[in-house]
Amino acid sequence: MEQEKRQINLPVFLDYQSTTKTDDRVLEAMMPYFKQFSNPHSRSHSFGWKAESAVELARERVASLINAEAKEVIFTSGATESNNLAIKGVANFYKNKGNHIITVRTEHKCVLDSCRYLETEGFHVTYLDVQKNGILDLELLKSSITDKTILVSVMMVNNEIGVIQPIEKIGKICHEHGIFFHTDAAQAFGKISIDVKKMNIDLLSISGHKIYAPMGIGALYIRKRQPRVRLTPMINGGGQERGMRSGTVPTPLAVGLGEAARIAQEVMEEENIRIRELRDILYNEIKKHLPYVVLNGDYEQRIAGNLNLSFPYVEGESIIMAINNLAVSSGSACTSASLEPSYVLRALNIEKDLEHSSIRFGIGRFTTREEILYAAELIVSSIKKLREMSPLWEMVQEGVDLNNIKWDAH
C-alpha cells in the first residue's frame, strides 16, 4: 500500500458528479476554433462556412449519442439553461391547454426552482415523493395526472445518489395521457445508453462539463414529430438555434461537446465496466473495515461512478475536514456549501443523523485503482478516529439504543 500511495498525486479527485476534467482529446479538437475564429452564423464567406460545418458536426455527434436527429438538438450554455428552457418554454407555450406540471422532490435545484417560479405565474406543480431507494413509484405518478397536466419532468440519473429512474416506463405513461415528458440527463448523457425514441422522451437536457467537455456548453433535445414539441424561447434576439435560443453559438465549446459525445459513444461500455469495478472495490473495502455504513439509494439501479454513503455518529463536515486529501462532496456541489442536510437525502426519509453524515464519491475516466485503495484506507482510518471522539459512538458500543433516549433541551 505504501508503494501504491507514492504512485498517486494528492489530493485525489473523487467528485465526478460535480464536474469532470476536460479530456485532452476534447481540448485538442477545440483549439483550432480558438485560433481560426469565425461566427458560425456568418454564411457569406468561407470562415463562417467552416465554423458552421464544425458546429453542425458537433450537433450530429450529440444527436447520435441519444438516437435523435441533428435538427432536434439545440446548443445552450449548460443543463441549467436547458432545464429552464424546457420547463418554462413548454409551460408558457401550452398554458392555454393546461396549467399542471409534475416533477419529483429529488430533482436538481434548477428544475425545482423553475417549477417554483411557474407557481408564481399561476401554474400548479405536484412534487412527487420517491421510495426509500430513491426510485419513483409509477403508480404515484399515474394517480397524480389530471386533465390539466401538460408536462412531467423526471431526471434520468440523480446527481447525489446516482439512481437511474425507469425513464422508458415514465415516458410511456406520459404519452398514453398526451403529456410532454422532459428529463434532465446531465448525469446520464455519455454514462448510460439513451434512446429518446425508445424511451418516449420529448425533451432532454445535456451538460458539457459532466462528460469531459468544457463548462459553458450544453444542449437540449426537442422532439420534432410524434409529438412535435414547441417552446416559448427565454432568450430573444437573432433567432439562432431554430429560434429557440438566440445568441451566437460558441464554436469551440460546441466542438468540444461534440467530441466528448463521440468519445463517450466509443468508450462508454468498456469505461463503465472499469468504473463499476472501482466503485465496488471502494464500497467493499469500506464495508469490510467499518461497521455501521449505510448506502443511500438503490445499488443496482445506479450509474457506475456514484457511491453515496452515510457514516452514523459523525458529521459530514467533520469527515470532509478529516479527509482533505480527497476531493469529495457532502451533498450536491450546487448546495454543499450550506450546512443544511441534503434535500435529496431528506426525501429518502432516512434518519437525520444519516442525512448529516453522508459523503458522495464520484468516480470517473481518470480515476485509478491506486487512488481508490488510498481513498478507502483514508476513509476507514478517519471515520474510526472521529468515532473514537464521539460520545454517541461510545454509547452505541455500550449497547445503548439512541432512539430510546429522551434528550433534555437546555
UniProtKB/Swiss-Prot annotation:
PROSITE patterns in the cross-refs: AA_TRANSFER_CLASS_5
Residues recorded as bearing N6-(pyridoxal phosphate)lysine in the entry: 210
Signal sequence interval, chain numbering: none
GO biological process: [2Fe-2S] cluster assembly
Sorted UniProt keywords: 2Fe-2S, Cytoplasm, Iron, Iron-sulfur, Metal-binding, Pyridoxal phosphate, Transferase
Cellular component terms (Gene Ontology): L-cysteine desulfurase complex
Catalytic reactions on record: (sulfur carrier)-H + L-cysteine = (sulfur carrier)-SH + L-alanine
Entry-linked Pfam families: Aminotran_5
GO molecular function annotation: 2 iron, 2 sulfur cluster binding; cysteine desulfurase activity; metal ion binding; pyridoxal phosphate binding
Residues noted as binding pyridoxal 5'-phosphate in the record, renumbered to the chain: 79-80, 159, 187, 207-209, 248
Family matches, as PANTHER family: CYSTEINE DESULFURASE, CYSTEINE DESULFURYLASE FAMILY MEMBER
Function, as annotated: Master enzyme that delivers sulfur to a number of partners involved in Fe-S cluster assembly, tRNA modification or cofactor biosynthesis. Catalyzes the removal of elemental sulfur atoms from cysteine to produce alanine. Functions as a sulfur delivery protein for Fe-S cluster synthesis onto IscU, an Fe-S scaffold assembly protein, as well as other S acceptor proteins.
Protein known as: Cysteine desulfurase IscS
Protein species of origin: Ehrlichia chaffeensis (strain ATCC CRL-10679 / Arkansas)
This protein's encoding gene: iscS
